[in-house]
Amino acid sequence: MKNKQWILKKFPVGEISDGDLVLEENEVPSLSDSQILIRNIYLSLDPANRGWMSGQKSYVDAMQTGDIMRGGTIGIIEESKHEKFKIGEIVNCMGGWQQYCVSDGKGVRQIPQGTGFPLDCYMSILGMTGLTAYFGLLDITDPQPGETLVVSAAAGAVGSIVCQIGKIKGCRVVGIAGSDAKCK
């Protein structure tokens, strides 16, 4: 079976340009024991993607040239040799910019079915972005009704959710963003 994959060929200098990422078609490897094959159906394209292409270690290990471009995905398990995961289950993981990924199950999260939430919510409000906003605001600051909450990067993914949670909690919310256009 063939797998289309975006490969980091060189570290971009400034803006990403042709040739930094290349679309390749490779064979999907056979599974070993305790592995799963996931067919990706959603890919989260995030500002962090550009930072990961720097070759520098940050909160995650640095990418190397030749790596599949890193990215969060939602997918369906197509094949399983892992006792925890069953064929047909929907999961969230760092599956990368590719049609299929093979995983040993580490970092793979099963998405509950029958919740009524669209799947893409598990990559935003019910995923890392939403959890960062929720716990970062409510566990760290404990905002109270009537308080003023100042949010930097308020136009960003996490910041915009922090603003909404602040409003729900009864705060006066002041958002800061990097440009006039982002403030509109």
Language model feature labels by segment:
Residues P12-D18, P47-A48:
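Short N-terminal binding/cap micro-motifs at the start of the first secondary-structure element
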